[in-house]
Amino acid sequence: MARIGDGGDLLKCSFCGKSQKQVKKLIAGPGVYICDECIDLCNEIIEEELAESGEVKWEELPKPMEICQFLDNYVVGQAQAKKALAVAVYNHYKRIQAEATGAPSADSVELAKSNILLLGPTGCGKTHLAQTLARMLNVPFAIADATALTEAGYVGEDVENILLKLIQAADYDIKRAETGIIYIDEVDKIARKSENPSITRDVSGEGVQQALLKMLEGTVANVPPQGGRKHPHQEFIQIDTTNVLFICGGAFAGLDQIIEARTGHGGTGFGARLRAVSERSTDDTFSQVMPEDMLKFGLIPEFIGRLPVITNVRSLDRPALVQILTEPRNALVRQYQRLFELDGVELEFEQSALEAIADQAMLRGTGARGLRAIMEEVLLSVMYEVPSNPDAARVLINREVVLENVNPTIVPREFTSRRSRREREEKSA
């Protein structure tokens, strides 16, 4: 039997207007009513919003081999670094998954966090690897520059600003930010200036390492939402860094000499064999790194202990740079071909031109990061001319264009259509 309101009317849902007879259930509140259909609709909207917010679905956590295969689509080479990162990231989020689902452990073992230290020269993919990992897992990602950090109270950025970048990347969703990834670049620049502790304060070196310790290990940090220096009286945001994965990267110039001195491969002493520069490989040397080498380099023991996973990225040779130009999904050649395609022009690179671009990047010592700058230089004149040339159909880049700065070959549209017509006739014959 339907209940009657004070005015004698049937009770209705305050949202959809359906009466009590038209729905299965009508729930009363202070002066309002909501039906079961509206409740179901609200649940659907909430689930959709949660899905769009990009929370990690722990039951779908990719396995290390799947992570490696995904990285292969975007990053060329670096097989060992990919393997180490895939395992470390998988174990990190598996640990969070176990805590989130409350999975019981037989002996109640508490799983510790394993942050990562990436060694390797500039332009070899350290930052790109971390960015690609975060994109695959759909977690917030922030990049911080260690060279700008100083101890609290000194001119420069506080270490808490790193967490502010992560919170901003998560659209101020603290729960989501607490499972994000932070990449701290140029971490070798915060090494203390000498191996022995100094009586003078090292505010941008050892002082920063000390300030980062609790954050790396896991603590509830107070983060000023507008930056702590200019707005000292603002309310702080609290964020727990226990489940934030930290990846630290740096070139560590000079570390190879420390490792060689320890392993006996250096050239010191009367009986030592002097190795030619061509025999030495920084990549092979970095693969033998030990915590004691990092200590001699200038990192404090507590900081090294909070980065248990140490791996290195290898220098990029000529074939690897050519692969970077052409093979990844967002390869540079594909990007520029797409730009020309928007103007209705086909862009074509000869193999010799790609090799010349790779050689130039190696000469400059900028690695993969320098490839775009070289491409811009090579294509500047043609990118200036082609949009105003309606007759241009195809642009051909060869070795001479790259090395001798000659103008590329622009094939007119009439010639291209005539050639394609001839090819069609040959096929039909």
From Swiss-Prot:
Keywords: ATP-binding, Chaperone, Metal-binding, Nucleotide-binding, Zinc. GO terms for molecular function: ATP binding; ATP hydrolysis activity; ATP-dependent protein folding chaperone; protein dimerization activity; unfolded protein binding; zinc ion binding. One of its GO terms (biological process) is cell division. It comes from the Bacteria. InterPro entries: AAA+_ATPase (IPR003593), ATP-dep_Clp_protease_ClpX (IPR050052), ATPase_AAA_core (IPR003959), Clp_ATPase_C (IPR019489), Clp_protease_ATP-bd_su_ClpX (IPR004487), ClpX_bact (IPR046425), P-loop_NTPase (IPR027417), Znf_CppX_C4 (IPR010603). Residues 1-54 form the ClpX-type ZB domain. One of its GO terms (cellular component) is HslUV protease complex. CDD domains: RecA-like_ClpX (cd19497). Zn(2+) binds at C13, C16, C35, C38. Component of the ClpX-ClpP complex. Forms a hexameric ring that, in the presence of ATP, binds to fourteen ClpP subunits assembled into a disk-like structure with a central cavity, resembling the structure of eukaryotic proteasomes. ATP-dependent specificity component of the Clp protease. It directs the protease to specific substrates. Can perform chaperone functions in the absence of ClpP. NCBIfam families: clpX, PRK05342.1. Belongs to the ClpX chaperone family. This is ATP-dependent Clp protease ATP-binding subunit ClpX. It comes from Salinispora tropica (strain ATCC BAA-916 / DSM 44818 / JCM 13857 / NBRC 105044 / CNB-440).
